[in-house]
Amino acid sequence: YITLIQWWNKNATREGTHLYIGQDVARTMKADQLTRKMLYERSLSKVKGNCFWPANEILWNNKGVADSLKRNYHRYPALIPAYTHLHNRAPQEVKKLKTEWTAQGYMLHWQAEQSKTNPELASYFVIYRFENKEPVNLDDPSKIVAVTRETNYLLPYDDGKHKYRYVVTAV
């Protein structure tokens, strides 16, 4: 395992290459391996993440892997790293961001051109929530409340006593 990952890390030399390590949860994941694997992979410069399969093993929480991932490694949503070697411009910004009271609660709406294939246009949107006077920091994944392809989002409504600021980015 270590020899193979070191080889891939060394040989993934093309500029902008993203290296994701495949993990067969059912056949190769022993209970004590996850921590060692995750820490080692995160120490390598080219490794950008993991791909766990089969997906149902994660859904079934085989060997407690899903719990461990949520608790220790993936507490917050993650965005796919930008493929800047393919396209280095961000999609057009969202426009006309507004809230509206509906029968379901407060709904956040915005406008944006979308495309699954044109990188100039949004594929999906990331919604961040900040305390009213908190500085906006889009590098803080704990502030992500949703990732969606829709151009609206039902806001989580706590008790009406806290004011929040929402930011929507096009990705």
Language-model regions: role of each:
Residues 1, 5-86:
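Substrate-binding cleft of secreted/luminal carbohydrate-active enzymes
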Residues 28-30, 58-61, 105, 117, ...:
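Flexible loop/turn segments at secondary-structure boundaries
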Residues 47-52, 111, 115-120, 148:
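Catalytic domains of carbohydrate-active enzymes that cleave complex glycans
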Residues 65-120, 160, 171:
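Pro/Thr/Ser/Gly-rich low-complexity, intrinsically disordered linker/stalk tracts
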Residues 113-139, 163:
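Solvent-exposed loop/turn segments flanking beta-strands in beta-repeat/beta-sandwich domains
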Residues 138-146:
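Local beta-strand/beta-hairpin segments that build beta-sheet-rich folds
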Residues 148-154:
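Short S/T/G- and acidic-enriched coil/turn segments that sit immediately N-terminal to beta-strands
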Residues 155-171:
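Beta-strand-rich modules
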